[in-house]
Amino acid sequence: MALSHSLGFPRIGRDRELKKALEAHWKGELDEAGLRAVGQRLRAEHWQLQKDAGIDLLPVGDFAWYDQVLAHSLAFDVIPERFRPAAGKPTLDTLFAMARGAVANKSGGSCCGGAHAQEMTKWFDTNYHYLVPEFSADQQFALSWEQLFEEVAEAHALGHSVKPVLIGPLTYLWLGKEKGSDFDRLDLLERLLPVYGEIFQRLAAQGVEWVQIDEPILVLDLPQAWKNAFERAYNLIQREPCKKLIATYFGGLEDNLGLAANLPVDGLHIDLVRAPEQYPTILDRLPAYKVLSLGMVNGRNVWRCDLEKVLELLRHAHERLGERLWVAPSCSLLHSPVDLEREDQLDAELKSWLAFAVQKCQEVALLGRALEAPDDASVQAALEQSRVVRAARAASTRIHKPEVQARLAAIRPRHAQRQSPFAERIAQQRECLQLPLLPTTTIGSFPQTSAIRLARQSFKQGKLSAAEYTEAMHAEIRHAVEVQENLGLDVLVHGEAERNDMVEYFAEQLDGYAFTRFGWVQSYGSRCVKPAVIVGDLGRPQAMTVEWIKYAQGLTDKPMKGMLTGPVTMLMWSFPREDVSREVQARQLALAIRDEVVDLEAAGIRIIQIDEAAFREGLPLRQAAWQGYLDWATEAFRLAASGVRDETQIHTHMCYSEFNDVIESIAAMDADVITIETSRSDMELLEAFERFAYPNEIGPGVYDIHSPRVPDSAEMAGLLRKAARRIPLERLWVNPDCGLKTRAWPETEAALVNMVAAARQLRAELA
């Protein structure tokens, strides 16, 4: 039979139980025993959900308290000295300190002396974030975290057939960074492999037959030294007990296909959603003894699978492989919401088009059954339902809109170009804005308090009238403006109290989007996002932000930034359509945002920020495909931004990003000011400016908003001095790394006091 399995399952829970438990624990409202009980209950529920869906081999080790890469760092004892316990093995407090920075806890204790958090960055080209391992030249590895073995025991006690999931040694090293002296982290491989050996020995002793080893870097452009290291590593790993399935996903193997096919392991998983073209070659080149796991159901989207189309390929594979064929989602279902059945308010038509993690498991299991029992009545009924749904979706009037198509067809190159070059624009902007040297600002959002969330919820439930809700939001805006005035910030924001999410807020006001109530996915730690779903052609029926920003500007003589989310980020942080290209969807969004930008300018707003936090996230994993993406992504931004006069200043913001290799394309966006995340990486991003003279203004973030830790002004001033060595003072801005939505007011004000003080200190020093 064709075995069905899952590469991983969402860990947050159908109702975000893990998020709530983590935050209660961090506030001192839930002790460690209570937190662990929630985790154990969720794991049991998730295994049962997958088993009930028909999955034969369940993943174990996909659960993590914060992040799976961080869990591996603890397992391997890769703990930076600033977090290392004085005695004994690491604890959950150690893990959370590494993730969030070390702060005093609510019960009065503290960990790690106020150490700053580890760097966080995007997991390949997804919107999930992982904690970057920090390696030292004298790095030693030791098995120091028992979580995987405890969870295998839990699953076995519940009677499940399990497949532990490990991040492979090459991918783990690739994801990390060297700290301190000059060395190559690949040289650490031989020290790391014995720990993997110990893990396999322990798992074999627990009765484990198969282990999934995730090596997604096999879909990247790998240096030859890393390719050689794969052969070296797996020649050693093959000696260890347990059968081993190498899992690749997020792209095609391409030039690494021969390497992956011939590694001395027992099976290989490939992603045929992202890279269907690799199927014939891998089928021909896979050794006759190996299992081939085909990722046929999209683990990163919410659309139902085209069962008939997928089954056609699987039948061919089944004829060739027989019992060596396994069926799976394309990747871990971490990137999918948990269960569509929780959605009790979606219209029936849209709901029939969707599938979340539970339903994707059902699809995987159905495909396996269809190979073994094609005439089974339940299989035939499911295939017929799939046909009906796809036909209905293709014919639906909510998808195609002639007026949007007409606007797209009318786009010309001049529509994506400002009136004058930056040098001319900036002179007019400086005359208009009259800002000091090193102007201070924030990225946009201020803390979303419980009062704000309650007001929004009450308004949605009809408990507050529109007028009452507007006044509640006006009060929040007044507070935000007053705080900023008192702090002495130079360019203000209205705080975004009225916005539930930087994408969903706009998506709710655009035609072509749909929304779920429980479509949450994990972004990092306890942070969950609920991506909107792009269903059809996109357009803006009316202004979205103008009245809020006008109100805020009326409260101050200082410039008030209009705050918008850019077309690429709107696309990347939504679940996109599958029937048209990302480029087309980005252009539709750009036209909608362009209309809003023009309306803000007409309302007297002199600075408009178009956030492109996800710009680099959209970059293809293979460099050969970069330029095509960068061309349409930069054009979409310019299309959104270029409808204004020269004296209107366009800002953009990008976060969690390594831009050294795409700095020219960022310059091609031609934003007047760009603010970027740099503090966690100690201004490492600014190395790009040593070889590329970035022409416009830039605000490198001077403190990390993802941690509750408040850095002092001296620390921020130190980062500014580093920045000033690479960026001319007259083009340097001072700002946090990102928006302040997830922080509390006391730490927000404390950090901004220090930030303004640092800017004033640098003005005095360097002016």
Swiss-Prot record:
Sorted UniProt keywords: Amino-acid biosynthesis, Metal-binding, Methionine biosynthesis, Methyltransferase, Repeat, Transferase, Zinc
Residues that hold 5-methyltetrahydropteroyltri-L-glutamate according to the record: R16, E17, L18, K19, K122, R527, C528, W573, E617
GO MF, any single term: 5-methyltetrahydropteroyltriglutamate-homocysteine S-methyltransferase activity
Any GO BP annotation: methylation
Keyword Amino-acid biosynthesis attributed: yes
InterPro entries linked: Cbl-indep_Met_Synth_N (IPR013215), Cobalamin-indep_Met_synthase (IPR006276), Met_Synth_C/arc (IPR002629), UROD/MetE-like_sf (IPR038071)
Binding site for L-homocysteine: I443, G444, S445, E496, D611
Record-annotated active site: H706 (proton donor)
Binding site for L-methionine: I443, G444, S445, E496, D611
EC number: 2.1.1.14
Pathway: Amino-acid biosynthesis; L-methionine biosynthesis via de novo pathway; L-methionine from L-homocysteine (MetE route): step 1/1
Gene3D superfamilies from the UniProt entry: 3.20.20.210
Residues binding Zn(2+), per UniProt: H653, C655, E677, C738
Cofactor: Zn(2+)
Catalytic activity: 5-methyltetrahydropteroyltri-L-glutamate + L-homocysteine = tetrahydropteroyltri-L-glutamate + L-methionine
Top EC category: transferase
CDD domains in UniProt: CIMS_C_terminal_like (cd03311), CIMS_N_terminal_like (cd03312)
Cofactor: binding details: Binds 1 zinc ion per subunit.
Membrane-spanning ranges: none
Function (record text): Catalyzes the transfer of a methyl group from 5-methyltetrahydrofolate to homocysteine resulting in methionine formation.
Similarity field: Belongs to the vitamin-B12 independent methionine synthase family.
Official protein name in the record: 5-methyltetrahydropteroyltriglutamate--homocysteine methyltransferase
